[in-house]
Amino acid sequence: MAHNNVLLAIARAVEERITEANAKAKPKEVKQLAPLQSTFVRAGQALDSKKKVTKKEAPHLLQAANDWKCDFDLPEFRSPGSSYVFPHVVALTTLKIDGYIISETARICIVLELTCPMEENLVKQHSFKQRKYEELASEATQNGWRFEKLIVEVGARGFVPSHVRKTLTRLNIKAKALINKLVLLAQKCSYVIWINRFNQDFQTWRLVEK
């Protein structure tokens, strides 16, 4: 329940930024960005001020094109009878990827992966997600695509690791506002699940607009 509610909020924010980027007349060249794992901070750990991200260090990826398309593994993005499929032109894979953003002219594919574990499992899940797409990234690169993976974690009790802000900034998303929304969604979902823990007729539903 929490996963898809949080993912939908992210997807709507991505759609807004894509619409804005596609309205730009002239794309800019965006250099390769540093991997995110170097900025992962555990719950309760202080953030080193020297590692704070500036706009100069993290230009957003959507500057590189103006023909972006996105899709997410959510029913809100499916028409009746359609299936969610990762673009075969990038790579062939059976992996279930939460979402992707693609520009065919710039040959850039950005995959987005969300996980909503218990806070004590955040570090393990982050490492797992980093390794999960190594083969896919290699194949995409061999096929002539620039491949970027963006990983977002939101803990079941609402903790959001510090690197998530940088991740969202890479897509030109107003990180603070969206993170506050994701925190509230995760907490609400956990509360709903808790109060329905003995309800055998419980069904999930959306806590954000469709």
Regions found by a protein language model. Give the residues of each.
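Well-ordered, non-membrane alpha-helical segments in soluble/globular domains
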Residues: 5-7, 126-135
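Domain-level recognition of nuclease-like catalytic cores that cleave nucleotide substrates
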Residues: 147-210
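Metal-dependent nuclease catalytic cores in nucleic-acid-processing enzymes
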Residues: 14, 130-144
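Short Cys/His-based metal-binding microdomains
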Residues: 1-14, 109
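Active-site metal-binding core of divalent-cation-utilizing nuclease and nuclease-like domains
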Residues: 9, 22-111, 127
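Short, flexible loop/turn elements at secondary-structure junctions
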Residues: 74-76, 101-103, 116-118, 155-158
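Short helix-terminating capping/connector loops at secondary-structure junctions
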Residues: 25, 29, 142-148
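Short beta-strand-loop-alpha-helix junction that forms the active-site gateway
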Residues: 96, 108-128, 154-156
